[in-house]
């Protein structure tokens, strides 16, 4: 508060509404359905998580072709990977035609929180971005080392492995950062 305005009558003033988040209009059906049984987390919990994390997640996945892990009945039941665009994903989930050996195929990408939440609505639990953008899919702008531990590999070993990859990259003049992979491992990411 700075001061009262003397140049306007109170009847002429109106409170401005706070801007709505991009994904606020995305309806999450069956928000009570449990998708992570061990943790008792529901589809609604997953949507809330992605809403809260969108500003950090989107810079990593936006405008990049995506491979999606979709689990309609939750983790531990039938899940499948999807990379091609299809009907019903939502109007903020876009298609980019990319050349493959078999011809051109439409791949999935998003560019905002609304698209992210539409993917959650379609039971997407993991999003795996390409190392290239939809604008230039033939020229990667990042390299990813996926450290996915096998049976019996400790978290301490994973961390040691990530540091080793980082150190070797630094020796060649490449800087990297680590992000969690969504599973048990980590990604060491190198911007190119």
Question: What are these regions, as identified by a protein language model?
Answer:
Residues 18-26, 31, 168, 174:
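Long, charged low-complexity interaction segments
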Residues 1-24:
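Intrinsically disordered, low-complexity regulatory tails
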């Amino acid at each position: 508060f700075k001061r009262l305005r003397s140049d306007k009558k109170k009847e002429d003033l109106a409170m401005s509404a706070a801007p709505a988040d991009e994904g606020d209009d995305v309806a999450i059906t069956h928000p009570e359905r449990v998708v992570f049984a061990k943790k008792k987390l529901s589809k609604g919990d997953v949507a809330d998580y992605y809403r809260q994390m969108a500003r950090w997640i989107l810079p990593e996945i936006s405008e990049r072709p995506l491979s999606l892990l979709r689990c309609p009945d939750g983790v531990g039941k039938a899940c499948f990977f999807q990379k091609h665009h299809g009907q019903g994903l939502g109007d903020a989930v876009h298609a980019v035609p990319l050349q493959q050996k078999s011809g051109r195929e439409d791949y999935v990408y998003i560019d905002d929180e609304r698209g992210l939440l539409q993917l959650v609505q379609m039971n997407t639990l993991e999003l795996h971005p390409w190392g290239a953008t939809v604008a230039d899919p033939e020229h990667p702008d990042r390299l990813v080392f996926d450290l996915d531990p096998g049976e019996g590999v400790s978290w301490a070993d994973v961390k040691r492995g990530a540091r080793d990859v980082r150190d070797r990259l630094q020796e060649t003049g490449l800087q990297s950062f680590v992000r969690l992979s969504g599973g048990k491992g980590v990604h060491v990411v190198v911007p190119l």
